[in-house]
């Protein structure tokens, strides 16, 4: 029996063989692709837009940079990056073709198609040469990866020396009472929203569960250091509902 079939991981609160998780996650995002951006606004009350602005503020995109936006889906991060960096180019990599289709349509509407490439690919085995990109971003995607450490190792590989990693992800609130209240909202409201708006309760139940399974801020920072990154720092957003993690290939 090979490692892929003998090892297990989590899919939300379920334990599944590692070899099955990617397909299950692919199914989730294929089903929600057409409603993904609308649901992000509803689930967060639009606050995710402020978090992404904070991500860009800290990242400070520069003209001419090459961005790799992994799990970039509909292109939200890439569009923000390109608007702040004249002459920059973005490659959006996602394992779900239907998410990329939504992104291409948005790029065409915004007349930005010539500054973007769209690639179907796996965060754990990126189809790019080493030392290629100036910036690597992943927004609300890394918690869905089967082996997070492998994805971070790949991020380090494809970045140029001096390149920067920036991760935006849901995280853990340091205050137990606030975490309890947030969990009540997440588990009782978000799946119902998913059923009403996207006719898909199960996918949003998974997304909520996946947030609770993701490592806390300090643990994740340690994983980034383990991949080889230096100057690793993080910033809490909305008191820790989400967090930004930054690291450099030095």
UniProtKB/Swiss-Prot annotation:
It comes from the Bacteria. Its EC number is 2.1.1.163, 2.1.1.201. GO terms for molecular function: 2-methoxy-6-polyprenyl-1,4-benzoquinol methyltransferase activity; demethylmenaquinone methyltransferase activity. It holds the Pfam family Ubie_methyltran. Pathway: Quinol/quinone metabolism; menaquinone biosynthesis; menaquinol from 1,4-dihydroxy-2-naphthoate: step 2/2; Cofactor biosynthesis; ubiquinone biosynthesis. It catalyses: a 2-demethylmenaquinol + S-adenosyl-L-methionine = a menaquinol + S-adenosyl-L-homocysteine + H(+); a 2-methoxy-6-(all-trans-polyprenyl)benzene-1,4-diol + S-adenosyl-L-methionine = a 5-methoxy-2-methyl-3-(all-trans-polyprenyl)benzene-1,4-diol + S-adenosyl-L-homocysteine + H(+). S-adenosyl-L-methionine binds at residues 74, 94, 122-123, 139. SUPFAM superfamilies: S-adenosyl-L-methionine-dependent methyltransferases (SSF53335). The keyword Methyltransferase applies. InterPro entries: SAM-dependent_MTases_sf (IPR029063), UbiE/COQ5_MeTrFase (IPR004033), UbiE/COQ5_MeTrFase_CS (IPR023576). GO terms for biological process: aerobic respiration; menaquinone biosynthetic process; methylation. Keywords: Menaquinone biosynthesis, Methyltransferase, S-adenosyl-L-methionine, Transferase, Ubiquinone biosynthesis. The keyword Transferase applies. HAMAP family: MenG_UbiE_methyltr. Methyltransferase required for the conversion of demethylmenaquinol (DMKH2) to menaquinol (MKH2) and the conversion of 2-polyprenyl-6-methoxy-1,4-benzoquinol (DDMQH2) to 2-polyprenyl-3-methyl-6-methoxy-1,4-benzoquinol (DMQH2). Belongs to the class I-like SAM-binding methyltransferase superfamily. MenG/UbiE family. This is Ubiquinone/menaquinone biosynthesis C-methyltransferase UbiE. It comes from Cereibacter sphaeroides (strain ATCC 17025 / ATH 2.4.3) (Rhodobacter sphaeroides). The lineage of its organism: Bacteria, Pseudomonadati, Pseudomonadota, Alphaproteobacteria, Rhodobacterales.
């Amino acid at each position: 029996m090979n490692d892929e079939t003998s090892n297990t991981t989590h899919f939300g609160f379920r334990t599944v063989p590692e070899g099955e998780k990617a397909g299950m996650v692919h199914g989730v995002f294929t089903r929600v692709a057409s409603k993904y951006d609308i649901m992000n606004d509803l689930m967060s009350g639009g606050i995710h837009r402020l978090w992404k602005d904070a991500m860009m503020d800290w990242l400070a995109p520069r003209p001419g940079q090459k961005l790799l936006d992994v799990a970039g889906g509909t292109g939200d991060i890439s569009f923000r990056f390109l608007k702040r960096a004249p002459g920059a180019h973005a490659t959006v990599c996602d394992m779900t073709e239907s998410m990329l289709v939504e992104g291409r349509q948005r790029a065409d509407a915004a007349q930005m198609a010539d500054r973007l490439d769209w690639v179907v690919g796996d965060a754990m085995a990126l189809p790019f040469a080493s030392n290629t990109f100036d910036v690597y971003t992943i927004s609300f995607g890394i918690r869905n990866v089967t082996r997070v450490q492998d994805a971070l190792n790949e991020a380090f590989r494809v970045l140029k020396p001096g390149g920067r990693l920036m991760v935006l992800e849901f995280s853990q609130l340091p205050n137990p009472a606030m975490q309890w209240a947030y969990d009540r909202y997440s588990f009782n409201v978000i799946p119902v929203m998913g059923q009403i708006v996207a006719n898909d309760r199960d996918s949003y139940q998974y997304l909520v569960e996946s947030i609770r399974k993701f490592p806390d801020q300090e643990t994740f920072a340690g994983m980034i250091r383990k991949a080889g990154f230096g100057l690793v720092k993080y910033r809490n957003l909305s008191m820790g509902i989400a967090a930004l993690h930054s690291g450099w290939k030095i």
